[in-house]
């Protein structure tokens, strides 16, 4: 069943064929579009796609720095330039964008934090999908936003774009060699060694690794893993924390065929040579984490798997 959004006059808003666009708007301009359309702003507290707690976008934008007041005429001019408003009323495209936003069948929320040579950058992006439409809202500061709408078949390109990082902008790694393509290690060991690095207690590493001796595997693929030497395990765990240049967190939310809400999570860590995924696995009664080399094209694939799990 397709969701129907009503405008201020009670008329149904029809979703038209998608013409991909990417525009930059202030938060005030997005609020103005919602006001003209007669629907809540995307930044208002609205029910989350999976039910449960309210999805207050404003509360998840970080530091709320007050934006300077902008005349309504200037906001309307920006919306006209973006083809979202014409003759003082929202265009069909403008109405369709908000229709998809407020009634998604599937939602993805992304947060990427990267420590560059020039400082730390954090970008947040919210994606909403309904039928053939995808609407994305992204920001780096909570004031200026990039609003994108595109066809669902091109969604994977937008998701991959969110994970793109120019490695030349990162600080150089202090380690001579990168991690193996795949490392499978006990979850509790990863947590303990990470805490030891943060507290500058690396002298505890030898004991921690010895307590889990023989449990860490490494190799070129998940099907070609061999037991790693304790010395290598110690180095890799220290490297994972010390060489970290950022992280990526993604959540996929939707409902299964019975209407029950669900969510799937993707976690990546950025090292000097690129992304690594962190995936929980179970082996011989141990709770393990598989640390696997990733590229930007792998993100939409992982999210597609999570989406299939959520909606099946």
What are these regions (language model features)?
Residues 225-312:
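Long, compositionally biased intrinsically disordered regions
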Residues 92-132, 220-265:
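Extended, Lys/Arg-enriched charged tracts that mediate electrostatic binding to polyanionic substrates
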Residues 2-80, 84-87, 95-96, 103:
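Short, amphipathic alpha-helical interface elements at domain boundaries
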Residues 134-200, 204-206, 216-217, 277-312:
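Mixed-charge, glycine-accented linear interaction segment located at domain edges/termini
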Residues 33, 75, 94-98, 159, ...:
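Generic structural signal of hydrophobic/aromatic residues within well-ordered alpha-helices
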Residues 72-73, 77, 82-162, 286:
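Accessory beta->alpha helical hairpin/"wing" motif in late/C-terminal subdomains of nucleic-acid enzymes
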Residues 61-95, 174-230, 307-312:
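Charged, compositionally biased non-catalytic regions
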Residues 8-9, 207, 251, 306:
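Low-complexity, intrinsically disordered/propeptide-like segments
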């Amino acid at each position: 069943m397709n969701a129907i959004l009503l405008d201020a006059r009670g008329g149904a808003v029809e979703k038209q064929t998608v013409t991909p666009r990417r525009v930059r708007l202030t938060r005030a301009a997005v609020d103005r579009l919602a006001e003209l359309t007669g629907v809540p702003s995307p930044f208002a507290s609205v029910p989350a796609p999976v039910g449960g707690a309210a999805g207050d976008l404003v509360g998840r934008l970080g530091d709320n720095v007050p934006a300077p007041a902008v005349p309504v005429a200037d906001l309307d001019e920006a919306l006209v330039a973006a083809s979202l408003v014409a003759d003082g009323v929202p265009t069909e495209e403008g109405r369709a964008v908000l229709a998809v936003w407020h009634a998604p069948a599937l939602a993805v929320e992304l947060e990427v934090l990267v420590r560059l040579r020039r400082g730390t950058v954090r970008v947040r992006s919210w994606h909403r999908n309904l039928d053939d439409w995808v609407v994305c809202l992204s920001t780096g500061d909570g004031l200026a936003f990039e609003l994108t709408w595109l066809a669902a078949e091109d969604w994977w390109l937008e998701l991959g774009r969110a994970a793109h990082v120019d490695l030349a902008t990162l600080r150089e790694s202090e380690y001579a060699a990168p991690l193996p393509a795949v490392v499978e290690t006990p979850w509790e060991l990863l947590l303990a060694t990470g805490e030891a690095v943060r507290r500058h207690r690396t002298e505890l590493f030898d004991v921690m690794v010895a307590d889990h001796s023989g449990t860490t595997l490494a190799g070129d693929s998940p099907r070609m893993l061999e037991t790693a030497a304790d010395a290598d395990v110690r180095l890799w765990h220290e490297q994972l924390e010390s060489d970290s240049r950022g992280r990526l967190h993604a959540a996929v939310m939707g409902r299964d065929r019975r209407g029950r809400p669900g969510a799937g999570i993707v976690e990546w860590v950025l090292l000097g040579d690129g992304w690594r995924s962190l995936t929980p696995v179970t082996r011989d009664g141990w709770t393990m984490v598989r640390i696997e080399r990733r590229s930007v094209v792998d993100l939409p694939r992982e999210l597609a798997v999570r989406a299939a799990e959520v909606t099946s």
